[in-house]
A protein has these predicted regions:
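A hydrophobic, multi-pass inner-membrane permease signature
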Residues: 1-292
Length: 292
């Protein structure tokens, strides 16, 4: 087979590969630097290299996992993640199913109302008063779950995916006596595994990284999510209580080590889960974003 590609095509491929390599380096280097620095005995690196200065040490990780605040933050974040993502998937799939059915007369006005909320809101103070005073969710983990129960963007993506499923399947199920709940949970959702995986990723990462709502609504330390603990460690001297028994001259280095180690501990669960759902990611986004 004759290769009909010209010199311009090869130049284009070369620059594509070059740009991708540069983007990979820019993306991976900061993460690898933090990983290496977290194992460094001095909390520093040898110049711009990824070689830990002073050798390798696991002391920072031992101190991190001995800190009860971090373990409590992990537990709270996992509770928020599991309960929040489950609620997100349930409500988003039901909402997407409703507005994807052409026989539903109010689907267009309902979609316009939801899209309006994507661009306009009452502001931070009314939101705080609503959640804290009217709903009485102050200092309650539900304040971190219920307000974001449905993402309109995710609902639109899932709705488009549902619209791509052949209507004949629904019609056949109705002839057999199936109702809307049966059609959604036994036909539509089993055929939408890719988009469900994408929704789990989107909602899960959002819950894992969320911290601002916790600053607003959570007052007791035993209810802090992990990201609040991480924020305190990074911007304050809260590492001092974790370094009992560390010599004075080594405290600065150990403080830096603890900060790096805490970042890795807070990031690791998402990094561990992502490879297992990555194969669904591109497929799900393409199915949900392009109709036809």
């Amino acid at each position: 087979m004759v290769d009909k590609r010209g010199i311009g095509d090869y130049i284009f491929d070369f620059f594509n590969v070059l740009i991708l390599i540069l983007l990979t380096i820019v993306t991976l280097y900061p993460f690898l630097y933090v990983v290496s620095a977290s194992f460094s005995k001095t909390g520093m690196m040898q110049g711009a290299s990824l070689i830990p200065h002073g050798g390798v040490s696991l002391e920072a990780y031992k101190l991190v996992f001995k800190n009860p605040n971090i373990l409590t933050g992990y537990m709270n974040t996992i509770i928020i993640l599991v309960c929040g993502t489950t609620l997100n998937l349930f409500l988003t799939s039901m909402g997407a199913y409703i507005v994807s059915r052409k026989q539903f007369a109010l689907r267009k006005p309902l979609m316009l109302m939801m899209i309006f909320t994507m661009y306009f809101s009452g502001g931070m103070i009314p939101r705080y008063l609503l959640i804290n005073n009217t709903l009485g969710l102050g200092n309650n983990l539900l304040a971190l779950i219920l307000p974001g129960a449905i993402s309109v963007y995710n609902l639109i993506v899932m709705r488009t995916n549902f619209e791509n499923i052949p209507v004949s399947l629904e019609e056949s199920a109705r002839l057999d006596g199936a109702n809307d709940f049966t059609i959604l949970f036994r036909i539509i959702l089993p055929l939408s595994k890719a988009i469900i995986a994408v929704m789990v990723l989107f909602y899960g990462v959002a819950h894992w990284n969320a911290w601002f709502d916790a600053v607003l609504f959570i007052r007791e330390r035993n209810m802090y999510p992990l990201q609040i603990i991480l924020r305190e460690i990074l911007i304050s001297s809260s590492t001092e209580s974790m370094m009992t028994g560390v010599a004075g001259g080594d405290q600065f280095a150990m403080s830096e080590n603890i900060k790096y180690a805490t970042i890795i501990v807070a990031t690791l669960p998402i990094l561990a889960v992502y490879p297992f759902i990555q194969k669904y990611f591109v497929k799900g986004v393409m199915i949900g974003a392009v109709k036809g």
